[in-house]
Amino acid sequence: MKQWSAHTDDIKALMRTLRGDTPNVMKAFSGLAQAALTPQALDAKAKELIALGISVAIRCDDCIGFHVKAALDHGATREEVIEALGMAIYMGAGPSVMYATHALEAYEQFKPEAATPAA
């Protein structure tokens, strides 16, 4: 079982390195992310649930961790996450079923009641 909190921390550290090595590219990426995530017709929670569904459908584990955490931070419930995963499975078929289990595991580890494993 993947430890999602530690995994996303590792990716954040690598992204900081990448930001130092390719500042122009990462600045442009950050601008794109900020523009896409700014609430307009959809609120931040809905956007993160969409991003989570896409993460599952395209099989991006690293994306799953970040978007599960962000969805929770914006108040997503387990039921909302499950519904988003259902849409990802519908759009991505069998492989999305497997990656939906990754997202569910990440949800269980990131939710506030989850105990943090000892390092």
What are these regions (language model features)?
Residues 41-58, 79-85:
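Immediate flanking context of iron-sulfur cluster ligation sites
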